[in-house]
């Protein structure tokens, strides 16, 4: 993996009034490295203004495979020399909450930087996916009477599909009607069936419905609708055999986005650690339920989102565990808007490819 060294030597830049404050916030969450470490990263020290004492530095910040000097704000303000478009976009579109970075940049080779961009999945478009989530959150889907089902009944349903792109903008949401699979471990919900459509699109989505109310599965020891081990494996399958770059999950607590940590690196997962991942998710659910189930009135939307959705402790642990597989899961909690808890607009990281 090559490292990107931001030299801040551009003559012009896109102007954002909040850029400096956002950069300072990111720097507080980034790793500090010193001048002597640069060579170990295959980089050479660069100083555009050697006569300026403040431009000479021994310290740098690192965020994933991006490195920049700790005096970059001085260079911008006093020398009117600006960072690259790539670095500027990383700072602008990286989302931070308290001491946690929700969407750290994907590690890409420096030769692919011109192919990197952010694609907006807007609030209005997410309302469509959220409507599918809400439809599936009520037991209204018919299971007909047959030899394996002694009486007609109604169950929940996940929904799935793909997002299509036109000129690097999401222009359509295609919904699959192939949600007719019932797992023997959970016979109360229809699950999506994998179809060839998934191979041909960069962004996949599916829903993890509620059980009528928030925290409705506490009796099953489930409070978070984390991406399952099967969700991770499905994303890897369509990344390796198709062109999938991310898999989006609409859940009661918010949006999960499954994607690689390092774009051109293999995923380190097999049958044995797939089983380990399933066990870990159950263990994490147990831990969360034990901690949060005593919160009064968890079925109330405000109570649920304030205590569960906006608690990042468990997604941090989830990501710490799955990092070994070269997988990261971005999590964006629901926000209250117009007196309802909605899925917030997000920006998906994308690398243009002819694969």
UniProtKB/Swiss-Prot annotation:
This is Uncharacterized protein R413. The lineage of its organism: Viruses, Varidnaviria, Bamfordvirae, Nucleocytoviricota, Megaviricetes.
